Amino acid sequence: MKLIVGLGNPGEKYAKTKHNVGYWVLDLLAEKLALSFDQKTENGIYVKQPDFILAKPTTFMNKSGDFVEELIKFYKINTQDLMIIYDDMNFEVGQAAIKTTGSAGGQRGMAHIIEKCKTKEIKRLKIGISRGENAKEYVLSPFLPKDNAKIKLVIEEAANILIFYLSNSFITTIEKFNANKNKV
């Protein structure tokens, strides 16, 4: 069973911030699949299908690993079937990258997930948000109007890639993503 987790911060205050692009991708993915997040735990919300789970932690970003660990243990999911979607300041707005492993790159939600899962071997889909002077203020602010079209396009592409991934291998998904990379 595949577990796809979109990271963000809960609450209306953070809904339109750069740090919530993981939520945005999951929301669009669920919408495209005509699914709703109908299951809830203390740490998050999710929708379970026979072959996959889409999940959003409702803890603050730096505690995202608690919810991921909870779902992995309860549903006996192998971390090889886990994919995390989150914002990355090392990529420009409009860029995305799929990785099979690596460090958290300063992203505290991903760092907590790596800590809880006890491995860096976690698939991830990083959504570029560019870099600001004050990282904390920057990630907790909305995108500039000039970036809205780019971010909308990359969120759409990310959701489409995940739809493809749900019925294909990760290797095939990476190949398709890389073939389409220059089109985003």
Swiss-Prot record:
Gene3D superfamilies from the UniProt entry: Peptidyl-tRNA hydrolase
Superkingdom of this protein's organism: Bacteria
A cellular component annotation (GO) from this entry: cytoplasm
EC numbers on record: 3.1.1.29
Similarity comment text for this entry: Belongs to the PTH family.
Cited HAMAP family: Pept_tRNA_hydro_bact
Record's protein name: Peptidyl-tRNA hydrolase
Gene this protein is translated from: pth
